[in-house]
Amino acid sequence: MSIYVGNLSYSVTQDDLTKVFSEYGSVTRVQLPTDRETGRVRGFGFVEMESSAAEDAAIQALDGAEWMGRVLKVNKARPREEKGARSGGGSWSRNNGGY
């Protein structure tokens, strides 16, 4: 599972995030999406840790904490929704039987 980290400073690096999160356990991966046009960090990232206990400890400690002059928003990442996905489920082409 991944951790979503929001409201990051635009000057943050993967090493910065790794150092902070490694205080709570082993970090296995850090992603910092960048803007296609400018190449600048978009202000959020994702961190994966070795255990869910480490993730929970990091979320508990860092959500709402001030870091690099900003108040962090840290929680479990939700799966990415596919483009064009509609909420509510169901299908318009459902076959509900015949006569």
Swiss-Prot record:
Residues 86-99 have a biased composition (Gly residues). Gene3D superfamilies: 3.30.70.330. It comes from the Bacteria. InterPro entries: Nucleotide-bd_a/b_plait_sf, RBD_domain_sf, RRM_dom, SLIRP/GR-RBP-like. GO terms for molecular function: RNA binding. Residues 78-99 are annotated as: Disordered. Keywords: RNA-binding. Residues 2-79 form the RRM domain. PROSITE patterns: RRM. SUPFAM superfamilies: RNA-binding domain, RBD. This is Putative RNA-binding protein RbpE. It comes from Nostoc sp. (strain PCC 7120 / SAG 25.82 / UTEX 2576). The lineage of its organism: Bacteria, Bacillati, Cyanobacteriota, Cyanophyceae, Nostocales. The gene is rbpE.
